[in-house]
From Swiss-Prot:
It comes from the Bacteria. Keywords: Antiviral defense, Exonuclease, Hydrolase, Magnesium, Metal-binding, Nuclease. Effector component of a CBASS antivirus system. CBASS (cyclic oligonucleotide-based antiphage signaling system) provides immunity against bacteriophage. The CD-NTase protein synthesizes cyclic nucleotides in response to infection; these serve as specific second messenger signals. The signals activate a diverse range of effectors, leading to bacterial cell death and thus abortive phage infection. A type III CBASS system. A sequence non-specific 3'-5' DNA exonuclease that preferentially degrades ssDNA with 3' overhangs or a mismatch at the 3' end. InterPro entries: Exonuclease_RNaseT/DNA_pol3, RNaseH-like_sf, RNaseH_sf. Belongs to the Cap18 exonuclease family. Mg(2+) 2 binds at residues 12, 25, 160, 165. Homodimer. The active site is at residue 160. It is an enzyme of class 3 (hydrolase). Mg(2+) 1 binds at residue 12. This is 3'-5' DNA exonuclease Cap18.
């Protein structure tokens, strides 16, 4: 994979429900995919009192606690944008990487546009499930993270903590990239 001018940033969010605006983004975790020690995380104040009980249960987060301890969404997005700018040089392109990227990107995109007016990731995201689907030629059913892990054998795991999950996704991304390189050599 060419990475000389592209900085792949693994991003994970935890939310109170399935769509931005009606539901809140509760936390952001991110790391540079090929340098995961370069990382960012924050908790956000809810923008809505709406929630799906199962979404809250899986995160272990509380809207009440986040009203007190979370960052104002403007501050959170400013900090996230500043972090992104700190890991990307002027001649480099930042690429959003996610597992089910369409979900995480929709919240990040919404919050960046509503609170800052633009999204430093632009209009596209690289989806790890789709990347694996293309590399492995597996069925879509076999692109779940638990199924991918059986093949690529990551050392980390996801646990619905946004930063932990971003680091896990970054590891899956690197391992799938390595698998892709191996398949090229096998041809």
């Amino acid at each position: 994979m060419r990475t000389d001018k592209e900085i792949f940033v693994s991003v994970d969010v935890e939310t109170s429900g399935p769509i931005p605006g009606k539901y809140s983004m509760l936390s952001i975790g991110a790391c540079v995919a090929f340098e995961p020690s370069k990382q960012f995380s924050c908790y956000l104040k809810p923008i809505s009192e709406d929630f799906i009980p199962a979404a809250m249960e899986v995160t272990g987060l509380s809207l009440e606690k986040l009203h007190v301890d979370g960052l104002d969404p403007v501050d959170a997005m400013v900090q996230f944008k500043e972090w992104i700018n700190s890991v990307v040089k002027e001649d480099e392109t930042v690429v959003f990487v996610g597992f089910n990227a369409s979900f995480d990107w929709s919240f990040i995109n919404y919050y960046f546009h509503v609170y800052l007016g633009d999204n430093p990731f632009g209009i596209a995201a690289l989806d790890i499930k789709s990347m694996y689907f293309g590399v492995s030629h597996a069925s879509w059913r076999l692109t779940r993270s638990s199924e991918i892990a059986k093949v690529v054998k990551p050392e980390t795991y996801g646990d619905h903590d946004a930063l932990h999950d971003a680091r896990y996704q970054a590891e899956l991304f690197r391992l799938i990239d390595k698998l892709s390189e191996k398949k090229k050599l096998d041809r």
